[in-house]
């Protein structure tokens, strides 16, 4: 069975305490690999490496054009790793193999664009008009510099894409990074280290650590040697991170939960609107922070819309994420599946009308995995919990409205 190590100071390393964790395929419920599972000591070692690399100037003082060339070399190299990264991403996260391949390609394009922008379009220095005050002889300008050590804490729904977008922005501007993937979906970033070691990126500039957020993640957020934290995940954890960062006055970027509305008016093209609603709700089995799970439909077209939405949803092919024919895959973990199923029960008790799905699939081939049928509730009221709380799963709440003022 494959075993993956962390990446600190240019080397793959075991957890200092020797701890390992199992990676589980959500499509089968089976263990597919093990990986190093670190703690505070590993977090601090990664931060020390990033701090030393930044302060040395080996990356932060490098000419932007040279940094750009190195990052573009990495993007070129990643083309060779598309099949490998996409495979492990799909196996580990439950994302469809057809989508995870696209995620890697998206990262490659983003890396190239950002590298070029940082080198040739970004204004590192900007002259300003002289101020009309007593300092008439002064020269006014803005000089922009890399910030320092940036920590990226990554969600489990799009692990490689989310992690790399936190990293490549920071790297392009001359910062050093420590990234922590989610414990449920760590493998793609650990596989990525194979490519990383083939580049000219200096040691310590990029570090990848894996472990529980309660210990390793906390150690990263409270380490005084960091300069910035970027986090994507739940609102509850975001509150904790902001609180921890405040104690050392660190910059924070938070991308947290959502319960987005998808508003369908009476003059909408119904077929087009149904397509959009399905994508907005059921992409990656509903495990997307910007999912439009509150589908708010004008009462004049409400019944017709619900009928079309249910028919199209029932036609989705539920299956294993590694099958190219699958349109709707598994949930990331049993814990998340249980959360989704509990919300479906809440919706029933609240009086919402369950018109589609609402349970695990009956297909015996899917028995071992963490699957939930795409689910639709009709006649949902805004006061219901399923309409107010983020479920983070394939549960659509279709809510009628009468007029635009409402």
Language model region names:
Residues 22, 36, 60, 266, ...:
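A structural signal for short, well-ordered beta-strand elements
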Residues 32-122:
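Glycine-rich loop-to-alpha-helix module at the N-terminal edge of alpha/beta enzyme cores
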